[in-house]
Amino acid sequence: MVQCKPPQEFSFGPRALKDALISCDLALKQMYTSAFSPSERLFLSEAYNPNRTLFSTLLIHSAYDWLLSRPEAPEDFETFHASLQLRKQSLARKHIYLQPIDLSEGLAGCPLLDHLRSCAEAFFLGLRVKCLPSVAAASINCCSRPSRDTDGLQLHTDGILSFLKNNKPGDALCVLGLTLADLYPHDAWTFTFGRFLPGHEVGVCSFARFSGEFLQAGSSVPDSALLEAAAAGGPETLPRERGRTLCFSALGMVQCCKVTCHELCHLLGLGSCRWLRCLLQGALSLDEVLRRPLDLCPICLRKLHHLLGFRLLERYKRLHAWTRVMVEIWSGQEAGEPSVSEDTLPFSADSGMGCESDTEPVTSPSEPVTPDGWSHPFPDGPEPVSEDGLGSLMASEVSLTLGGPVDAMEEYGQWLTACIQTLEREGAEEELLQVDAAVDALSRWEMFTGQLPVTKQHVPCGKDNVGLRRVLGDKFSSLRRRLSSRRFAKASSSHCRWGAEN
């Protein structure tokens, strides 16, 4: 992969970021002022403050980053607010359901579901997160195939999404399937981290790629005949991998929490983020996944706040409490089991999607695929949207070595502490006025949205161009007469031929 050394900043500028957060619409501006206190608005102004300290500008690390591979107009709050009018989602339902698939407490060597549930309840403050009883993949009408880079099987996402849609609880705001099995959305893709079905608020995500080198199988190589039958698509022939366990390091657990919250945000209606470093960025390589932060940028945070109505300070305090618990748990485990992890999460050999056709070589897993690219029919509903399938074709096999994940969690806790201190700061209104005045004094940057400006019909001309206009007018009149006479001559000749034939 071609790397940018050092990484290059990608920014829309303070004025564009402010418009994305607050909007240029008067009603949405008034909504923003009434929804947030001065201290909250000062905190959110970090989105467009040139001297921001809490949120980071996007960085381009390679020529194949998701941001460059899928250039699209980013979703600002005004666009998000307008899209809600088209959704039938009822926010009176306050339950998020997690549907484990071949996954139960203790299977992964730690209370994985408990960690995910507590993280999601802090992240989506005001919603209750429930775990449904685990279902066997063999009981789902789901196609499968042998994995290209492991000894296990990969499950096709469409069958799982159909199952979740047909078995969605009546009080569910959304349902997210969780599996330790690898997933694939199309035959041409090597794998995907997740996929959701727009309009039905159901999705599925896989944690298989976050186990690193800790995949252990009691029976690692199933019978070849069963593999061939399973690859043919028969759910009855899907072999059960007995004794299969996944052991997660602290790094892997954090990635599981990030992917879960990422998918749930999409199920609630938030689009991918292209403004600042944010959990809702897409990813085309594993290092992009690992670089994503565990929280939202201010623009996406306003979208989530609009849906759930929490207080920002309370949410960050809940996340801080969850982080402290996680640090205590993993600090004890690392002290007792130093050999469990060297905090190295290896890339797969293909680093994601394998392209075996002549279509677009790199496609975003976090956006709807184009009809002529990776389109794939889905019965009785809209096309599912893939999330974070790794799609860089130029990636080679590399190993990403990070610092201690517990240290990273402690840094995240320190960042949350800084957010809490900003939200508790007094005299925020005066400081906010200074920031707004400095940003409003900057020149506005017009964003290209993919539509060319409307051609002006009347171009004002000066009086000194009267002669030129007369000459051009005479010329066009002459051409018009010639064309008219030519059409009349052709019409006459064709009429004569038609009469002669009769």
UniProtKB/Swiss-Prot annotation:
GO terms for biological process: proteolysis. Binds 2 Zn(2+) ions per subunit. One is catalytic, whereas the other seems to have a structural role. Zn(2+) 2 binds at C273, C278, C297, C300. Its EC number is 3.4.-.-. The active site is at E263. Residues 336-383 are annotated as: Disordered. It comes from the Eukaryota. Its cofactor is Zn(2+). It is an enzyme of class 3 (hydrolase). The keyword Hydrolase applies. Zn(2+) 1 binds at H262, H266. Keywords: Hydrolase, Metal-binding, Metalloprotease, Protease, Zinc. GO terms for molecular function: metal ion binding; metallopeptidase activity. InterPro entries: Archaemetzincin (IPR052009), MetalloPept_cat_dom_sf (IPR024079), Pept_M54_archaemetzincn (IPR012962). Probable zinc metalloprotease. Belongs to the peptidase M54 family. This is Archaemetzincin-1. It comes from Mus musculus.
